[in-house]
Amino acid sequence: MMTMLRGWITMIVMLTAINAQAACSWPAWEQFKKDYISQQGRVIDPGDARKITTSEGQSYAMFFALAANDRPAFAQLFNWTQNNLAQGSLREHLPAWLWGQKDPDTWSVLDSNSASDGDIWMAWSLLEAGRLWKETRYTEVGTALLKRIAREEVVNVPGLGSMLLPGKIGFAEANSWRFNPSYLPPQLAQYFSRFGAPWSTLRETNLRLLLETSPKGFSPDWVRYESKQGWQLKAEKTLISSYDAIRVYLWTGMMHDGDPQKARLLARFKPMATLTMKNGVPPEKVDVVSGNAQGTGPVGFSAALLPFLQNRGAQAVQRQRVADHFPGSDAYYNYVLTLFGQGWDQHRFRFTVKGELLPDWGQECVSSR
């Protein structure tokens, strides 16, 4: 009788644990998988008629899978990326940035150039997956990928030093370089500094990029640097802070409070917080030189600013907007911004002062809506 009773108790405890794990999963991530990720591990952007997949999307999804302790999804994403974007090996090749429907009968790489924002997040996620899950294979591939990024996407710029190019082709001329300030999150730059040159100095040059290109407190989507003339802020085409730059504020907000760069960046970008508080919504576009804003940013912008805003009342306004207008199944970019911003806001993950992932795999249930 006692043996049978113990058996029932054990079964009840196990079922309770399983139900608790299911109930306390990350609902927004589970919905993202249903709406955007194929059974093979391909993140699909339905907003493009070619049903495209980008290295950025694959890398972000790998991060979310790691934060959610979703090892099967991570493995699927990794395998699909390696087999379809990296010619079978992320040790040997940077992933192509764009894949999709080439013609009615052909699905393949559409642009073989790389995109360093995806490469950076992918290398970091692999290294952290190796550490947290004790998976040597991920550590080895992440290390090899990071070395390849340093060889193929990092350049020495006179007057600046080591800088991360947006991709291996098309961003460097004889005396001119084009950069995207959102491509290297400061906490990831801090993490990579443990690997020595060029990462040990890239963190400081990346800070210069962020601070020196935001004269009015708004980071540009893209900016050019010339060897003898510096940053080209008054370019022939107006520099805009918009869909790329929103990630600069997101990364800044998610930095560890003990990181000395965070206070400097929050101070520099305070005008973005002030403008959002004044209008109740983030702007869609801001002229980097004049500070003039226009349009209303989509709901993903509100989610991205949840870690960045330091005023609790301002956070509450954007939090409510996200809850009221949660991205659907046809808004890839808004959804990934929401997974980052809202996920952080719900304490599903944090970054340590060294840039490592601090997941909350055992947290209480938190609603995503």
UniProtKB/Swiss-Prot annotation:
Keyword set, alphabetical order: Carbohydrate metabolism, Cellulose degradation, Glycosidase, Hydrolase, Polysaccharide degradation, Secreted, Signal
GO cellular component, as recorded: extracellular region
Reaction catalysis annotation: Endohydrolysis of (1->4)-beta-D-glucosidic linkages in cellulose, lichenin and cereal beta-D-glucans
Localization per record: Secreted
Known function: Hydrolyzes carboxymethylcellulose.
Intrachain S-S bonds: none
EC category name: hydrolase
One Pfam family of this chain: Glyco_hydro_8
PROSITE patterns according to UniProt: GLYCOSYL_HYDROL_F8
Organism: Salmonella typhi
Signal in keyword set: yes
Main location per the UniProt record: secreted
A single GO molecular function term of this UniProt record: cellulase activity
Signal peptide region: 1-22
Domain of life where this protein originates: Bacteria
Protein name: Endoglucanase
NCBIfam families named in the record: PRK11097.1
Coiled coil residues, start to end: none
Stated family: Belongs to the glycosyl hydrolase 8 (cellulase D) family.
GO BP annotation list: cellulose catabolic process
Catalytic activity, EC: 3.2.1.4
Active site per UniProt: E56, D117
Pathway: Glycan metabolism; bacterial cellulose biosynthesis
